[in-house]
Amino acid sequence: MAEFKVVVSDYILPDLEIEREMVEAIGGELAIGQCQSAAELIELAHDADAMFNTYFGPVGDEVYAGCPKLKVVVRFGIGYDTIDVEAATRHGVMAVNVPDYCIDEVSDHAIGLWLALGRKIVAADRMVRTGEWGMKPLQPVLKLQGQTVGIVGLGRIGKQMARKLSAFGVELLFADPHVGADVDLGGVACRKVELEELCRLSDAITVHALANDETHHLLNAECF
């Protein structure tokens, strides 16, 4: 009989065999679901000691009340987007994130999107596939060197964005009330400005901020 139970509320990985092996190696049981409602999650986790969560949410009072043995809930990600931390605290459940989750993957993808938009890569691909050719229909195709790129949120991913973007010869700005102007980026120049100035000066803006009450609707029509 297992000494404890760990549940995965939902997942996007191909499989969770590595996680199962790790849990079972220390005497636990791993139960896996793709929960779409609080009722489904409670059915899966009513006797669980720990929970891993990806996208299903919110994990709040109803779930915690229905899982009285639960001691910890872990978000597969940097932000607590799907976890009601205050509710977890009320029920004596520790809420944990993964602060180094996919830093390179997210920054690589964001830069890929910037390249695709600026250089019209997706539009050009669609043209070629339909038998069209030529640069004229794609104009303007932007020169990226010399652009001003604004980074909203200079956490781990934002900092990695700054380091990678510096190789393109762009001017970098950032807006983040929690990071000082003297932040060390290993020699990369990235000037701190207020959000209004960042929006006014930037050719492109990349947002790497937690989803919470402070950042909800942070960028809106008034910014542009």
Regions found by a protein language model. Give the residues of each.
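Residues that mark the start of a beta-strand
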Residues: 5, 147-148, 171
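Short gly/ser/thr-rich secondary-structure transition/capping motifs
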Residues: 30-36, 54-55, 129-136, 185-192, ...
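Rossmann-like adenosine-cofactor binding region
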Residues: 58-63, 173, 177-224
